[in-house]
C-alpha cells in the first residue's frame, strides 16, 4: 500500500528547526566546555597545593632533625656547646657536636646551622656555615617561637644569650602558597634533646 502524502508537503527540516537544534547543541557544548575548564583549574590548584604541602612537610622534617640536636655535647668533660646561638621570630641558629669529636663542623653534615626566612623572596634558607641555600620556596610566612622548661613562651625576640640558654623547645609555623592554590600552614613543636 502506498502512503498518501498531502499536496505541497516536503520531507526535511525547516530553517527554524535547524536553528533551534544548533542553539541547543551550542548550549550543551558550552556547558561541557565550562565543566572541562573548571575541572582542569581545580586539578591544577589541587596539584599545586599537594606540591607545597609535600615541600613544607619535607622541610619541617629536616628542620626538626637538625634543631632537635642543638646543644649536643657528648664529650666528657663537655666542651660547653651553646645550642641556641641566635634566635628571633624568623631566624634560628643552632649548634651541636653531633659527631662527638669536640669540634663544631661547618661542612656537611654541618653542626652549625642557621634557618632564616627571607620575606622579599618568599624563601626559607638554610646556611650550614658555607653559604645560604634555599630549602623551601613559595612561602608566605615563617615564625619561630621559643619555650622554656615550663612551656612558657620566652620573649622578647631576638633572645638574649641568657634567654637563649633557657630554650627547651622551638615552635615552628610555616605557611606556603603556590599559584592560586589555597595557603597551607604546618606547625610543629620541637623538643631539644640535649637540654
Feature map (PLM): residue ranges:
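Aliphatic-rich helix starts adjacent to a transmembrane/signal segment
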Residues: 2-69
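Extracytoplasmic low-complexity repetitive segments enriched in small/polar residues
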Residues: 58, 62-76, 102-103, 109, ...
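Short linear sequence signals and composition-biased patches located at protein termini or domain-edge surfaces
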Residues: 2-5, 41, 51, 68, ...
Amino acid at each position: 500500500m502506498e502512503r498518501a502524502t498531502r499536496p505541497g508537503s516536503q520531507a526535511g527540516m525547516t530553517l527554524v528547526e535547524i536553528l533551534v537544534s544548533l542553539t541547543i547543541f551550542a548550549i550543551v557544548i558550552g556547558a561541557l566546555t565550562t565543566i572541562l575548564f573548571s575541572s582542569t583549574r581545580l586539578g591544577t590548584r589541587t596539584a599545586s597545593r599537594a606540591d607545597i604541602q609535600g615541600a613544607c612537610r619535607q622541610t619541617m622534617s629536616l628542620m626538626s632533625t637538625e634543631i632537635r640536636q642543638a646543644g649536643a655535647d657528648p664529650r666528657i668533660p663537655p666542651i660547653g656547646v651553646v645550642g641556641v646561638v641566635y634566635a628571633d621570630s624568623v631566624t634560628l641558629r643552632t649548634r651541636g657536636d653531633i659527631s662527638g669529636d669536640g669540634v663544631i663542623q661547618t661542612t656537611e653534615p654541618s653542626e652549625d646551622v642557621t634557618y632564616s626566612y627571607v620575606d622579599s623572596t618568599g624563601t626559607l634558607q638554610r646556611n650550614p656555615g658555607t653559604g645560604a641555600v634555599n630549602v623551601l620556596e613559595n612561602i608566605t610566612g615563617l615564625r619561630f617561637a621559643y619555650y622554656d622548661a615550663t612551656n612558657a613562651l620566652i620573649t622578647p625576640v631576638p633572645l638574649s644569650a641568657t634567654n637563649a640558654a633557657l630554650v627547651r623547645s622551638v615552635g615552628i609555623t610555616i605557611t606556603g602558597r603556590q599559584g592560586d592554590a589555597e595557603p597551607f600552614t604546618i606547625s610543629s613543636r620541637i623538643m631539644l634533646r640535649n637540654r
